[in-house]
Amino acid sequence: MDYLTIILTLLFALTLYEAFSYLSRRTKNLPPGPSPLPFIGSLHLLGDQPHKSLAKLSKKHGPIMSLKLGQITTIVISSSTMAKEVLQKQDLAFSSRSVPNALHAHNQFKFSVVWLPVASRWRSLRKVLNSNIFSGNRLDANQHLRTRKVQELIAYCRKNSQSGEAVDVGRAAFRTSLNLLSNLIFSKDLTDPYSDSAKEFKDLVWNIMVEAGKPNLVDFFPLLEKVDPQGIRHRMTIHFGEVLKLFGGLVNERLEQRRSKGEKNDVLDVLLTTSQESPEEIDRTHIERMCLDLFVAGTDTTSSTLEWAMSEMLKNPDKMKKTQDELAQVIGRGKTIEESDINRLPYLRCVMKETLRIHPPVPFLIPRKVEQSVEVCGYNVPKGSQVLVNAWAIGRDETVWDDALAFKPERFMESELDIRGRDFELIPFGAGRRICPGLPLALRTVPLMLGSLLNSFNWKLEGGMAPKDLDMEEKFGITLQKAHPLRAVPSTL
């Protein structure tokens, strides 16, 4: 009898709580969403693949929904129509950032163009990025560096083809991306598979990616900030400190060289010159922090996208053959591809779009935040709410995409859909004023790497695995990675 009383009391309390939550949601006019549990809210619904969990919930609650994740009110956008409302029509209202606690290490969020509020400092840094690093003229001027680094990747794969060893595609692409950026910025390689010191830098950047991608209790329960229960901020402080120390040394070295040997005219020189001529735009601290931004944002996204593209090629041999046939016809089998060739390779570009549709590198984009209450499609988004745009769900929306889960590059052959933030059905790089500033570089680099790998070798899965058996399971983190790294064996065409 006592147990029955306890059970009935608990059921009554739960019913009251559900009713209170429902009335509270109605009173506040929040978007629909699951009823939260006491204290944890809806955290239990996320699982280890929250992009999938929230996509599934959106089918029940709608393309705009609200959840309580711990202490944080979170609004989730899951359709192109709602994304356009948030990222274009009300872009300014949704332009602030929800800053992960890990980015409080070394106060990185106070210097980073990714996390700064849209204000004068942010505008100055965006101007520097757009004019001096990612402009068409600047990218044209250093095109030869990217070609050289991609050819070094091909040479690495050729060595493996001669020995019959498999290539860890993601790791090889990660190393190439690091060296590509380090040459653009510092005119030197910072990683080498045969150098312990270079390996240390590669591991440092990799560890930053790993820590940044871990779910952090503090992000859901800010009252735990001083405790840092998982030690994530502590480890990020160590990693950031070591990278910034390295960058500081490279800046000192360059300043000395400029006094005696003149300028190299790479990104670092351009930034130092800008700092001297317009110190109000950027200073030394911002230069070092911008370099950190570039490495963190530009390596994992590039390598994971290339790994997914190669995985889809190996999973779908007919698509790989079609891509290779186009390359052979337009470029010539085994010949070097230049960036200027990409526009003559429509099917390769479609492969890239389809890869980014199914496997957006950052599934929730970068979290946004509203500083004031905002109305969206009749619903209230309360002040301080975190806003997640589920680009993964939008790219797999069955009301927009025919056979949405199938890899079909052909769907883009007659389509005008673009990935530059104008078409909200496909926004792997975001949209609006917060769109990824590195987009112009990514649109050159990833197709060049993929086309070069496919035009230089035939590829098969390690151990004679059949294409249908290739595991395409995802691993959620700062980027959307393959749960099981792609290992493939190159052979001579």
From Swiss-Prot:
Main subcellular location of this protein, as a coarse class: endoplasmic reticulum
Ranges annotated as spanning the membrane: 7-23
Membrane topology: Single-pass membrane protein
Cofactor section: heme
EC category: oxidoreductase
Binding-site positions, heme: C436
Disulfide pattern: none
Ranges per topology, Lumenal: 1-6
Tissue expression notes: Expressed in roots, stems, leaves and flower buds. Hardly detected in mature flowers and fruits. Expressed in the internal phloem-associated parenchyma.
Note: The recommended numbering of geraniol gives (6E)-8-hydroxygeraniol as the product rather than 10-hydroxygeraniol as used in most publications.
Name of protein: Geraniol 8-hydroxylase
Gene: CYP76B6
